[in-house]
Amino acid sequence: MMFMLILMSCSHWTITTQPLAAPWLIPRYLPPLHLHCEGPLQPLSRVVLMCLCILGLILNHPLFLVWGPSFLWLHRCHPLFTYLGGIIIYCQVISCGLNDVNVSTISLQMALWRPNESKVYLPPTPVSKVISTDVYVTRTNVYYHGGSSRLLTVGHPYYSIKKGSNNRLAVPKVSGYQYRVFHVKLPDPNKFGLPDADLYDPDTQRLLWACVGVEVGRGQPLGVGVSGHPYYNRQDDTENAHTLDSAEDGRENISMDYKQTQLFILGCKPSIGEHWSKGTTCNGSSAAGDCPPLQFTNSTIEDGDMVETGFGALDFATLQSNRSDVPLDICTNVCKYPDYLKMAAEPYGDSMFFSLRREQMFTRHFFNRAGKMGDTIPDELYIKSTTISDPGSHVYTSTPSGSMVSSEQQLFNKPYWLRRAQGHNNGMCWGNRIFLTVVDTTRSTNVSLCAAEVSDNTNYKATNFKEYLRHMEEYDLQFIFQLCKITLTPEIMAYIHNMDPQLLEDWNFGVPPPPSASLQDTYRYLQSQAITCQKPTPPKTPTDPYANMTFWDVDLRESFSMDLDQFPLGRKFLLQRGTTPTVSRKRTAVGRGH
């Protein structure tokens, strides 16, 4: 409409209409209509112009007469664009000449909807949706404090020591660069003495714990642990000038400090680690001395596993045959790194609903490796020397360093409150257990102990003394748990059974197997030689899925208390909530009759 008004108000104008539809859709009966006018339009002229435009459309498409009267109503919406019962109509203003004004061509169209002639794609099969625990778990206002006693461990920082003919473990390996995975066992709230007997209905509901606060206490002073190898594969100091050495064994006694790491991960399942291990070759085409293929491997992080120290998350026992490319404490071990990607993408979010980490490292020394080069440098990368035939080792390596440790950068000895987990599990302790994975290399000091072999020590002689190395660790774990209840409707029971059937077994809500319609044979005397040999009964599946794994067990089943103000973490919890203890220990006085 605005376009038509502009035309009608101009002193000189020209309008040309031309059908653009294909000949098989809109036949062309007359040539395009050309109109030219000079001078401003009078009201009567505007009416004439409108009629001429309508006439041009009618002449270019006779079918327009079928619903021509409706055009007067549609014209108010747009004068150059109409819809004709499923047929495409194109109207184009080819040229519009105004005095000293350039106007571009305007093209208007409307597509015709046709049935889809391509392949029909069915929607994907619906899958069960994982819902948050906040949907079907109801939280109460009852809180408990649970804390461990002082937890201590002492051992050798590089290797375990075995003595005797039976290789009895005398001193375990305890390093500041090991994972500490605490398996915290909680009491069953359904067998707990509650302050309010009407808190839940035992016929249709079950109780469980939700972790809402945690503090990992660390004792011992800050310190940097040093590791090394008496036969470290260090050929040259590539940071400084050197001379090529053709010795067969150029290993040296080298020590270093590792990357600095602080982390702890909280979940109701153990943390998942990742590392690179030795893979398999296709068709057995590998020969002795070939580079081993690498395979990405996931595994559960257990207590005592080595952390990634700056040399990579590798299985050094299978990928480094010389036992001298890394220090003693990891040369025959697997260094694992937490698989944060997999734990974050876990459907139910049980392995990591709370985590903290801090890592830092820089490179201190630069070396290269001694040995025969497995990969040859391409000739186009360098110009050969006329005096040196062998360019030497180009397998460069470095020694890591975690730099300075400071109390200002500590993640421990601080309370943390869990309000919203990153996954669907918002702190629910399924199975009355939680797993706490801890790494703290800022307290990795290795102490030296010395014992004299002779009583007369007036004159110093190094061979009269024996030197020992030990590492000590100290922990204190405190938690705040919130009592929650869950109503076991058929839908919720089916959902929990799909998530973990053992939970319903622990709650005495077992799902019986479907009845068998086939007839089974049962012999009476199973040990009789008169009958065929009977298959042994399959072993019963252990109820504890982590029985064969190594964890530091912490039993809190007798350490729960509602007196939050009697514990450091409990007082901090009450302070941040702005509340005071609501449970009264006073008994109501009972009146006596006289």
From Swiss-Prot:
Molecular functions per Gene Ontology: structural molecule activity
A GO CC term assigned to this protein in UniProt: T=7 icosahedral viral capsid
InterPro entries recorded: Capsid_L1_Papillomavir, Capsid_L1_sf_Papillomavir, dsDNA_vir_gr_I_capsid
SUPFAM superfamilies: Group I dsDNA viruses
Family classification: Belongs to the papillomaviridae L1 protein family.
Job description of the protein: Forms an icosahedral capsid with a T=7 symmetry and a 50 nm diameter. The capsid is composed of 72 pentamers linked to each other by disulfide bonds and associated with L2 proteins. Binds to heparan sulfate proteoglycans on cell surface of basal layer keratinocytes to provide initial virion attachment. This binding mediates a conformational change in the virus capsid that facilitates efficient infection. The virion enters the host cell via endocytosis. During virus trafficking, L1 protein dissociates from the viral DNA and the genomic DNA is released to the host nucleus.
Protein name as catalogued: Major capsid protein L1
Organism: Human papillomavirus 27
